[in-house]
Regions:
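Cyclic nucleotide-binding regulatory module and flanking cytosolic helices
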Residues: 40-93, 138, 143-144
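Polybasic "coupling" helices that flank or enter modular domains
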Residues: 158-159, 174-241
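Cyclic-nucleotide recognition modules
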Residues: 131-189, 193, 197
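Phosphate-/nucleic-acid-contacting segments
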Residues: 217-301
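Cyclic nucleotide-binding regulatory domains
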Residues: 96-158
């Protein structure tokens, strides 16, 4: 699949399943990715009992719904309703850590408009991103594979909201089989593909191509074309020197593809950004679509 073919699909969100990637020529039938008004997820009473100094418990009304996370949206109504009372909204701040490497996982997070990086760290302090999680997935996949912890570190790379649930509650639902197990296992396979492709990309492709891939994957998990991100954080995620990111971002800005200023990146020309990216972006997105499109979720409704 050619890199430019990644533009064939448009990402939106639908309450009933993973129907977010549709041919661009059908765009007018599905609304805009910037328009969230056609979603029908259920609002939650934002009362949270747990929190930390950086991931604060959130009190009062908020504009987010469970259906804005696509894994939750793919669940049948009875499962959705059963889990809803235990899903609590939390504000995830930029740079906050959801779990450290080897730490016992107490919660599972379903991002809504936040993005979380899964990082692998070396003894010398160097780190690299192995996967990125947004409103297409969840943080805490190791719990479903029988582990209580993972070697990766989960760090918020873009602030926003998520819904979280106690690990024991969701694992118990998973062990009962049915729709949740199907959705989680399909997502796990897609996440493995992303991790593998990221490793290949970081080994063989130029920094500019990696940056384009990373920006596109981040945008796909956001409701806007603007990212709040420092070049230092991007460099850490890609496992490259900051100077390399500065040079690559400068070329993209000079070409009119992005605008970067004071930690904010605005994508101005996504089609051209897709053309500059390597094939890794399209490979990962195609696999997510193949595994998690509405056609494959036979139990979703």
């Amino acid at each position: 699949m050619e890199a430019q073919d990644a533009g064939l699909y448009y990402r939106g969100i639908d309450r009933i399943g993973w129907t977010d990637l549709v041919p661009r020529h059908e765009l007018r039938k599905h609304g805009s990715s910037q328009d969230w008004s056609y979603m029908e997820g259920k609002s939650m009473d934002a009362s949270v009992h747990y929190g930390s100094s950086k991931n604060e418990k959130f009190h009062g009304p908020h504009p987010h719904t469970l259906g804005q996370n696509r894994l939750l949206a793919a669940l049948p109504e009875e499962v959705y309703e059963r889990l809803a009372p235990d899903l609590e909204p939390v504000r995830l701040e930029l740079g906050s850590v959801l779990h450290e490497s080897g730490e016992h996982l107490r919660y599972i997070y379903f991002p809504v408009d936040s993005i979380v990086s899964l990082l692998c760290e070396l003894d010398d302090g160097a780190s690299g991103e192995i996967a990125v999680v947004g409103n297409e997935g969840l943080v805490g996949i190791a719990l479903f594979m029988g582990g209580k912890s993972t070697l990766s570190r989960a760090v918020v790379q873009s602030a926003g909201f998520a819904f979280r649930i106690r690990a024991d509650i969701l694992v118990r639902e998973f062990e009962n089989g049915g729709a949740l197990r199907e959705v989680v296992l399909l997502y796990t396979q897609a996440l493995i593909t992303q991790t593998a492709q990221t490793a290949v990309c970081n080994r063989f492709h130029a920094v500019e191509q990696q940056l384009c891939r990373w920006l596109l994957m981040s945008l796909d998990r956001m409701p806007s074309n603007e990212l709040t991100m420092t070049q230092e954080l991007i460099a850490n995620n890609l496992g490259v020197r900051r100077e390399g990111v500065t040079e690559a971002a400068g070329k993209l800005q000079a070409a009119g593809l992005i605008h970067y200023c004071r930690g904010k990146i605005i994508v101005l020309d996504r089609p051209k950004l897709e053309q500059r990216a390597c094939e890794c972006y399209a490979v990962v997105e195609k696999e997510f679509y193949r595994l998690l499109s509405k056609r494959t979720l036979s139990t979703a409704r």
